[in-house]
Amino acid sequence: MAYNFLCETTTEPNWGKLNKLLKKYNQLESFPFLEATDEKFGLAISVPMKNVGGSAYKQFIHVNKLLTKNFKFTVYDMYYGKEVDKEHIKVIRREIT
């Protein structure tokens, strides 16, 4: 089991650079994918249940900022089906800490 996030962008990111940056977040797992039907580029982020806690939450906050600010991704919480924003981040904190 894991807590999952879907990240989407319409601009193809530099996957090599992104992968290098994400490697240091060892509490999270990620993998890229292409949504061929609507020409969006996607990234899945997971917090495995074995990693749930304050450290994983802090890492997710850093990754969320990295993805939204530097790579122009929109991040969605797959459990609730909502975009991760300033309000919803409080819900995520309760779920993964």
Predicted regions and their residues:
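Acidic (Asp/Glu-rich) sequence patches and key acidic residues
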Residues: M1-T97
